[in-house]
């Protein structure tokens, strides 16, 4: 493939953007090489500035569950912009969005719109601290909840990709308020609550870890956390920025049947636009200003164009059978990848929950951050580049989940598997 224009753009970008990108994982530092620059996207495909086409399993890191540039979403945006781009005042679309979310996610009796998943998690933790009068939070190794200071402790996503467990610039006094647990560690959770339970405002967790690749919870683990939080008076926060409306229409909490006190959302609810939200029990949400004393605000929150895009996307995912078909397509892909690896004599396993999946270069089951980081990263990096050269774009890090869309039909998946058979053969050489 020719990447001359992408190469030139990356060189230019590095003179004006730190590392040449606006989010670290995009720079390909984990896998090596240079990123391609996207010119446009449609359906299951990305097209770069050099005219190359890629089957895309990143999906803008999750929002593109119905494929890129879906006509219904695009047309909704086009209609909305005729009336203005931003009002800084209430509009009907944000009410409809809140009603849609509360209708699909019963644990959310009220919702506050924000502009990103990071804003949502920061705001949810502030609410938890204000509501409980406590300061400490518990998170999990490898889980990523945005770039808020409290969360950059043993974090996943770009932090894990770059091998940085904490970030310079985070005050020690603040990071000391964040306790960490191993994901799927029942005994560790019980012991930590026995030690610091009266100080804990909230437990925040990705119910399916998507930022240390894709790691589902063991049976009963989320309910175990629910029980501990209730017993000790702490709030349980599900970060459903990735899983919300993807692993099931009602998110991971519907899929696993566990009810959190607060939930955070993003990605799909923006349809590709910058949107986040947090919601939960009415008695908690009514403590947010102006209804209550806990302050949170945003100039662009509830932006009418973003609301239009998100509402159109949420309408698409409510079509009968949408999530069943998405899960079946993801299963077909995962089974095909394992078969292709096995034929090449390469140790590979996969994890999948609905339309999320993870590919691990190991024979072992992966159920924790430690197991994810023990996989063969060198082989993953070789596989990534072999697939990219064959026109298939996977997440440029061994520590990021993959995402299926409804635009990935049987033909696209078979083309992916054909590329994988050749790519695994390359890795085996």
From Swiss-Prot:
InterPro entries, alphabetized: 4pyrrol_synth_GluAld_NH2Trfase, Aminotrans_3, Aminotrans_3_PPA_site, PyrdxlP-dep_Trfase, PyrdxlP-dep_Trfase_major, PyrdxlP-dep_Trfase_small
Enzyme class: isomerase
Compartmental location: Cytoplasm
Top-rank lineage group of the source organism: Bacteria
Enzyme Commission number: 5.4.3.8
Cellular component aspect of the GO annotation: cytoplasm
The keyword Metal-binding belongs to this UniProt entry's keyword annotation: no
Modification N6-(pyridoxal phosphate)lysine occurs at: 267
Example of a GO MF term: transaminase activity
Co-factor(s): pyridoxal 5'-phosphate
Pathway this chain belongs to: Porphyrin-containing compound metabolism; protoporphyrin-IX biosynthesis; 5-aminolevulinate from L-glutamyl-tRNA(Glu): step 2/2
Cysteines joined through disulfide linkages: none
Catalytic activity entry: (S)-4-amino-5-oxopentanoate = 5-aminolevulinate
Key word tRNA-binding present: no
Family: Belongs to the class-III pyridoxal-phosphate-dependent aminotransferase family. HemL subfamily.
Quaternary context: Homodimer.
Protein name (record): Glutamate-1-semialdehyde 2,1-aminomutase
Lineage: Bacteria, Pseudomonadati, Pseudomonadota, Gammaproteobacteria, Lysobacterales
Gene that specifies this protein: hemL
């Amino acid at each position: 493939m020719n990447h001359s224009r992408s190469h030139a753009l990356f060189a230019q970008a590095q003179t004006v953007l730190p590392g040449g990108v606006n989010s670290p994982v995009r720079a390909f530092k984990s896998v090596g090489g240079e990123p391609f620059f996207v010119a446009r996207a449609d359906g299951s495909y990305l097209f770069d500035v050099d005219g190359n086409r890629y089957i895309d399993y990143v999906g803008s890191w999750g929002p593109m569950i119905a494929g890129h540039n879906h006509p219904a979403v695009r047309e909704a945006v086009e209609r909305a912009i005729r009336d203005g781009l931003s009002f800084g005042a209430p509009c009907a679309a944000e009410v409809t969005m809140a009603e849609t979310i509360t209708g699909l996610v019963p644990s959310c009796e009220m919702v506050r719109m924000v502009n990103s998943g990071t804003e949502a998690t920061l705001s949810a933790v502030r609410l938890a601290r204000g509501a409980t009068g406590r300061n400490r939070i518990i998170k999990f190794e490898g889980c990523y909840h945005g770039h808020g200071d409290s969360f950059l402790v043993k974090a996943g996503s770009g932090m894990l990709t770059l091998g940085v467990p904490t970030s310079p610039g985070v005050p020690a006094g603040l990071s000391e308020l964040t306790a960490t647990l191993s994901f799927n560690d029942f005994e560790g959770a019980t012991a930590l609550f026995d030690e610091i339970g009266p100080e804990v405002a909230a437990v925040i967790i990705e119910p399916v870890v998507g930022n240390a690749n894709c790691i589902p919870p063991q049976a009963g683990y989320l309910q175990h956390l629910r029980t501990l939080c209730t017993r000790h008076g702490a709030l349980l926060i599900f970060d459903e920025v990735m899983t919300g409306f993807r692993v099931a229409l009602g998110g991971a909490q519907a899929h696993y049947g566990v009810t959190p006190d607060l939930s955070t959302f993003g990605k799909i609810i923006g349809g590709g636009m910058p949107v986040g939200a947090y919601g939960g029990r009415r008695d908690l949400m009514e403590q947010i200003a102006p209804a209550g004393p806990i302050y949170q605000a945003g100039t662009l929150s509830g932006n009418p164009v973003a609301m239009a895009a998100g509402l159109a996307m949420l309408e698409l995912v409510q079509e009968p059978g949408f999530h069943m078909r998405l899960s079946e397509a993801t299963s077909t892909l995962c089974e095909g990848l394992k078969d292709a690896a096995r034929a090449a004599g390469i140790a590979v396993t996969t994890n999948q929950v609905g339309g999320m999946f993870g590919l691990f270069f190991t024979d072992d089951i992966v159920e924790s951050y430690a197991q994810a980081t023990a996989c063969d990263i060198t082989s993953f990096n070789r596989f990534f580049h072999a697939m990219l050269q064959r026109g298939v774009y996977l997440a440029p890090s061994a520590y990021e989940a993959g995402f299926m869309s409804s635009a990935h039909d049987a033909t696209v998946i078979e083309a992916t598997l054909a590329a994988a058979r050749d790519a695994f053969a390359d890795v085996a050489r």
